[in-house]
Amino acid sequence: MSDPRQQLIALGAVFESAALVDKLARTGQISEAPLGCMLGSLLARNPASTLDVYGGDSLNLRDGFKALASALERKPGSLQREPLRYALAMLTLERQLDKRGDMLDLIGQRLDQVEQQVQHFGLVHENVIASFASIYQDTLSTFRQRIQVHGDMRHLQVSSNAARIRALLLAGIRSARLWRQLGGSRWQMVFSRRRLLNELYPLLRG
């Protein structure tokens, strides 16, 4: 697997988180499978490939790849504006997080604790999701620049939805970190759009 392809998988996961946050904020519902995929990526240890972080199947990131393609194609009619806004905000927050070694250590310690919880309850249990959400609240949401989620207030005010949104933002920022570790940069999204799309279309076809 080429480096650009690995970068795209990680970037697609950022957009997958963004798309799920948007859907949850607007409708109050998302499927358990994509939620589990993104939460599982937070606990992935020593994966054989980037795709293995996300369950080993590009179909798990299909909505993210679609949202990323719409951003790169720049067609006003198909652009998914809110997912794009969330994704760019996650990339920005990850850069701020990178300067905070103390916070990275804390997140790592807290994720170790969640991993033990998962063994008892399962990955998408509300207690586990609440723990992921509290990590986000105690760390990333303390930055001056925060991610403002827009949607239907009836859904956003439900505590379980708020927890899932925070957990998904944490997963998206983890994927943003992986993307940058693989050599990804925001300049590529500006100056290498055609090359990225050529790599992305086969992933969209599964």
Curated annotation (Swiss-Prot):
Its main location: cytoplasm. It holds the Pfam family DUF489. It is a peripheral membrane protein. The keyword Cytoplasm applies. InterPro entries: HflD (IPR007451), HflD-like_sf (IPR035932). SUPFAM superfamilies: YcfC-like (SSF101322). One of its GO terms (cellular component) is plasma membrane. Keywords: Cell inner membrane, Cell membrane, Cytoplasm, Membrane. It comes from the Bacteria. It is found in: Cytoplasm; Cell inner membrane. The keyword Cell membrane applies. HAMAP family: HflD_protein (MF_00695). PANTHER family: HIGH FREQUENCY LYSOGENIZATION PROTEIN HFLD. Belongs to the HflD family. NCBIfam families: PRK00218.1-2, PRK00218.1-3. This is High frequency lysogenization protein HflD homolog. The lineage of its organism: Bacteria, Pseudomonadati, Pseudomonadota, Gammaproteobacteria, Pseudomonadales. The gene is hflD.
